[in-house]
Amino acid sequence: MDVTVVGSGPNGLTAAVICARAGLSVRVIEAQTTPGGGARTLPDPEFSGVSHDICSAVHPLALASPFFSAYDLTAHGVRLAVPEIAYANPLVERPAAVGYRDIDRTCAELDDGRSWRKLLGPLADDCDGVVGLLLGDRRSFPPSLPAALRVAPRLLGQGTPLWRLLRGEDARALFSGVAAHTISPMPSLVSAGAGLMLAMLAHAVGWPIPIGGSQAIPDALIADLRAHGGELVVGEEVTEPPSGVVIYDTAPTALLSIYRDAVPTRYAKALRRYAYGPGVAKVDFVLSGEIPWRDPRLAQAPTLHLGGSRRQMALAESEVAKGRHAEWPMVLAASPHIADPGRIDSQGRRPLWTYAHVPSGSTLDMADTVTSIVERFAPGFRDLVVAVRSVPASQMSRHNANLIGGDIGVGANNMVSALVGPTPRLNPWTTPIRKAYLCSSATPPGAGVHGMSGFYAARTVLEREFGMGLPALR
């Protein structure tokens, strides 16, 4: 093989597709018995008509990622449902804060809609420029100077104590729930950057949900890989270096066990010092009916941030970053059947997907905690629970080896890691190991189902190893 890709997550498959389209022979090797990495969907072990998204469930970047946009997922058979409500944030003893696809409606329902519009309106008007900047390779001149000038002051405003300038407790909670996707202390530049991009995308393109589950995205990439002569092998763990060029969609530390003494001493030391971030505990529910939310608007919100107020979310993220369980942890929830009724089985059962933010490696079963938090905003929720599938953070790596300690970002979310990657290198997708490259979320631009880490790794490999440019993606 010209190129072997280890790991079949969205980044690995992106790199594989690009290399195959360039005319190279490509093989993808996946340790799990099913491909897709963080974008897999599997049937419930008891109720086969109900399927659970194993890691990611909602995909704000499916339409906006520069790679997915150029590749055109929909042209490759991925059907995306874009709900009217992108996300919402229930609040205690007051109406929820709701992020509609329509920014006008969002602002009309917030206490101070003008503040929200001032923050996000100009970004939504330049969606491509903003996404190109925030998902850039961190080494090129900003692709859009106007976008950079719009983002910079807002990044400082929401990534520092200046974030108090966003007015209205509901708006503050609405933004903080999105920023908390980074599982990092708030305010910070990292959480602000993610928050600005995701909140902006809600108004620019919406938060799409793949029909049939997240698996639709890797399935489309796999079909294209095979159409261009590539191969996929599942159920095979890589323990020795494959021949030829190898692109690793893995945690950086995996290279230590694969290459062992062949890892240069300084690089080995850097990898051993590599820091993983806080984790998530996964709790999937099978429900018999619709959740009885106090605020009826939430019945139309596929994505919910159940962290309470901005103050409560900031406290919870601070506690988790310090290695302590929060009394009220940040919980993300998704009801994909709201956008995709096909996720409801013939008996009316449907999935509820949730994550709870916890310290790295936590062994706690968070099912009761998550149930209590949902019940706080939807009395009677417990009565709907048919089954619970709970995975503590310490066990998340069993179904995805990259999620060490439950860290879905594959590395601590801080500004240094976001800019530099797993170790200080001019090109973070390279390694000092001959013909070995990285393309996981540990490399820029970081976590998320966007394919851009794989895109940049493939671009590097084509240029350095084969003297080739990027192929056509359509």
Predicted segments, located by residue:
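Mid-domain catalytic core of redox enzymes
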Residues: 234-345
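N-terminal glycine-rich phosphate/pyrophosphate-binding loop and immediately adjacent elements
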Residues: 2-129
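Flavin-binding catalytic cores
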Residues: 115, 290-291, 324-326, 362-401
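Active-site-proximal substrate-binding core of FAD-dependent oxidoreductases
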Residues: 464-474
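Helical element adjacent to the flavin cofactor pocket in flavoenzyme catalytic cores
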Residues: 197-238
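A conserved FAD-binding loop/helix module that cradles the flavin
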Residues: 439-462
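Rossmann-like flavin
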Residues: 92-190
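A glycine-rich dinucleotide-binding beta-alpha-beta segment and adjacent secondary-structure elements
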Residues: 172-185, 328-332, 380-444
